[in-house]
Amino acid sequence: IPQCRDVKESGQPNDKCRCNGKPCTVGKCTIARGDDNDKCT
């Protein structure tokens, strides 16, 4: 599982992945893409 800060998704704030509909800069996404239903853990 990639670290959220290592997942870049264009169009998201600061190119961070999105977990649970919010930009995530720490922890891990359970889904690499950081979809709306993702969790930041």
Curated annotation (Swiss-Prot):
Pfam families, per database record: Ornatin (PF02088)
Top-level division of the source organism's lineage:
Eukaryota
The record's section on InterPro entries has: Ornatin (IPR002463)
GO BP term (any one): cell adhesion
One cellular component term (GO) for this entry is: extracellular region
Swiss-Prot/TrEMBL keywords: Cell adhesion, Secreted
- Please tell me which stretches of this chain the record labels as motif Cell attachment site: 33-35
Compartments it resides in: Secreted
Q: What does this protein's UniProt record list under function?
A: Potent inhibitor of fibrinogen interaction with platelet receptors expressed on glycoprotein IIb-IIIa complex. May prevent blood from clotting during either feeding and/or storage of ingested blood.
Q: Which family does it belong to?
A: Belongs to the ornatin family.
Q: What is the name of this protein?
A: Ornatin-A2
Q: Which organism is it from?
A: Placobdella ornata
